[in-house]
Amino acid sequence: MKRKLNENNEPVLVSGTNKKKSDTEVSSAVANATPSSEAASSSSFADLGLDPRLLQAVAQQSFQKPTLVQSKAIPLALEGRDVLAKAKTGSGKTAAYVLPILQAVLKRKQINPGATYISSLILVPTRELTVQVTKEVERFSAFCAKEVQVVGLTDKVSDAVQRSLLQSSSPDIVVSTPSTAWRNVDSGALSLDKLTHLVLDEADLVLSYGYDEDLEKVARGLPKGVQTVMTSATLTDEIDTLKGIFLRDPVLLDLEEPDAEGSEITQYIVKCGEDEKFLLAYILFKLQLIKGKVIIFVADVDRCYRLKLFFEQFGIRSCILNSELPVNSRISVVEEFNRNVYDIIIASDENEMMGDEDRPAPNGDGKEEAEVDKKHENEDEGQDGEASKAAPRPKKKRKMDRKRDKQYGVSRGIDFKNVAVVVNFDLPLSSTSYTHRIGRTGRAGQAGMVLSFYVPKELFRKHIPTSIDSAENDEKVLARVIKQQKKLGREIKPYNFDRDQVESFRYRMNDALRAVTKIAVREARTRELRQELLKSEKLKRHFEENPAELQHLVRHDGELRTARANPELRHVPDYLLPKEGRKGLSAAEIGFVPLRKSSDRQKKGRFFKKGGARSFKAGGRKPDPLKTFKAKRKTK
């Protein structure tokens, strides 16, 4: 079935094709009067017809009622329909496909308890998302753990180890990236002969991460009649391609639920120079003007370490998340951040930015699409491609790209819990990336704040040591971001502060930046990678011995100490603080101060006068050793 996108960026049938039935589209209002649509209006999980053990697990997760995507998708999936669900980040898409899969496994085990085979395959774009989805399946199957077995293929282990894991545990559900899944299918470790359910989570990212060949090979190995569920935050050309490969007469859920998430997010922008980014970051975190858990997004790996070393100068602890770190270390960082071990994560978003950079602009320049685009998260995609192409990566950094993990992603899919603030230290290259970044905060009705730094054209390249190429397009990207957020009914406000007060801290910022040299950054990358490789081996052994818990904590926010240390920068003197924030002590708080020296100081003075410390005055006369020498006669 051939399809194309209409002016609303929605898949439609190509004129002239003869098909019995087009895709069934269900928007926020129920479109067709099927039995499933009536069930979709359920106000509780009990109305969805789930197993009591699953309902008990749902209650344990403190889920009060199903979200819009859950109430629409779960009944359709239980009926055996193929589903393509488009809903915003944080709307509960994972539970929307996990619960029907578990229901099908439990139903099959009741009919044939002895049948053990892989019946469900969940494909995700990143290793971090593999771990997250595996844990979600384990949580929802907590009260039926004996009947349901799940395996997540995440660790960078040999094929032989993965084969033994799949054969020994006899899982019902496998979670993996497409490349890892196909490698095991090709080796015979993963059998798809009896597969009944297939899930493509974050489907719009799967192709952009370069899994097209792996997906085609997996599709050729699927048996007939496999039920497929695809979830995505956006509807793009990639989705249309995947739909033609995997789905048969799917139900399209294009859901726009009440914007509770976005309404809780307060967005601010700051116009600043390239070096002023570091100045503002120092003030915000050292003076604790930002409180709570924070994710700081930067453009690349070098910026990660430069900002971390800069923070170290002032005693600000932070940990790093980028594609060069071992997968076990990345998983550990996310897990411990969610358990409140760390408060600040500096995350590089280079994979998503590279994806936008490499994506060709549709319709040439993309102007026509910008005029008729009504999909908020895909707005001006062609212009985003132009902006990203205008800022190519330096050739020196291309060598470093080879070490990066293509299966790394941080701004999409990963469930960071209780994030209070998202700081766009470097503005992304597209409005779509901005939308996904701010989706890390303000989740589940909680309040959140987004603070974005942007460099105007007149300040670009004014401070070479801290300059990056992508900052040249900050104004263009910001204009599209503001336009996109305005369509969503959100406002981006300027972040107001007293610039005179900020300038008084500049000399301290300059001292810290001078210490963070290119050599220090390069040594920090090498040292951090070496340390994390050792930690990763410890974590891998611990995961093998204790798969259900992670009590062995390995700190990831230690100091790298490759930059020259300035201990005096760790303390902020009172005279730099505004009058309202000074620690001025009253006379009552100071206490009694005697006029004369205390007795212990007097004793110390007498001791030095007598020559107890054998200290001589500068320029004074040295004692004659013949006169001062004393010796006692030896007694027999």
UniProtKB/Swiss-Prot annotation:
Any one of the GO CC terms: nucleolus
Alphabetized SUPFAM superfamilies for the sequence: P-loop containing nucleoside triphosphate hydrolases
Compositional bias (Basic residues): 392-401, 603-612
Stretches assigned to the Helicase ATP-binding domain: 74-253
MF terms (GO), sorted A to Z: ATP binding; ATP hydrolysis activity; DNA helicase activity; DNA/RNA helicase activity; RNA binding; RNA helicase activity
Pfam families: DEAD, Helicase_C
Bilayer-crossing regions: none
Keywords, comma-separated and alphabetical: ATP-binding, Helicase, Hydrolase, Nucleotide-binding, Nucleus, Ribosome biogenesis, RNA-binding, rRNA processing
Bias (Basic and acidic residues): 356-378
Entry's Gene Ontology BP terms: maturation of LSU-rRNA from tricistronic rRNA transcript (SSU-rRNA, 5.8S rRNA, LSU-rRNA)
Annotated binding of ATP, by residue: 87-94
Bias kind Low complexity: ranges: 31-44
Enzyme class, first EC level, given as a word: hydrolase
Catalytic activity: ATP + H2O = ADP + phosphate + H(+)
Localization terms from the record: Nucleus, Nucleolus
Motif DEAD box in this chain: 201-204
EC number: 3.6.4.13
Its biological purpose: ATP-binding RNA helicase involved in the biogenesis of 60S ribosomal subunits and is required for the normal formation of 25S and 5.8S rRNAs.
PANTHER family reported for this sequence: ATP-DEPENDENT RNA HELICASE RHLE-RELATED (PTHR47959), DEAD-BOX HELICASE 56 (PTHR47959:SF21)
Entry note about domains: The Q motif is unique to and characteristic of the DEAD box family of RNA helicases and controls ATP binding and hydrolysis.
Family, as annotated: Belongs to the DEAD box helicase family. DDX56/DBP9 subfamily.
Protein name according to UniProt: ATP-dependent RNA helicase DBP9
